[in-house]
């Protein structure tokens, strides 16, 4: 499956995954599509806060925001999926607080965001169960643990 990935690093965070890792995670999540084009922008908290405030009216930086491409109906067959914005410091903080391996948490959030770009959501319980099941299956293929196994509290802040 050809994937055109534009990785933009606008963060000073350490321990960021490599472009090859981002590509592998996206290809796994998007394997049902023949072709895909997307941008992943890695940001610090200031930009994450600004975007979350502007688009979700939430006064905090969230881990991942998805922006599906708004493609006119006559061009629906083009491979453009949209953009993911991932706040690197939030990802690192959540991994620490939730006692999750950092790379596993990155993989989860990239897969989660890609699934949103494919139209999956978690607004109601049935949708959430479908999306979380798929996330678990994909992460298991990578050898990562179930990201929801230790959810004693609210799930990590997720985009809508």
Swiss-Prot record:
Zn(2+) binds at residues 112, 116, 122. It comes from the Bacteria. GO terms for cellular component: cytoplasm. Keywords: Cytoplasm, Endonuclease, Hydrolase, Metal-binding, Nuclease, Ribosome biogenesis, rRNA processing, Zinc. Residues 141-160 are annotated as: Disordered. Its EC number is 3.1.-.-. It is found in: Cytoplasm. Binds 1 zinc ion. GO terms for biological process: rRNA processing. The keyword Isomerase does not apply. Its cofactor is Zn(2+). PROSITE patterns: UPF0054. One of its GO terms (molecular function) is metalloendopeptidase activity. Belongs to the endoribonuclease YbeY family. Single strand-specific metallo-endoribonuclease involved in late-stage 70S ribosome quality control and in maturation of the 3' terminus of the 16S rRNA. HAMAP family: Endoribonucl_YbeY. This is Endoribonuclease YbeY. The lineage of its organism: Bacteria, Pseudomonadati, Pseudomonadota, Gammaproteobacteria, Pseudomonadales.
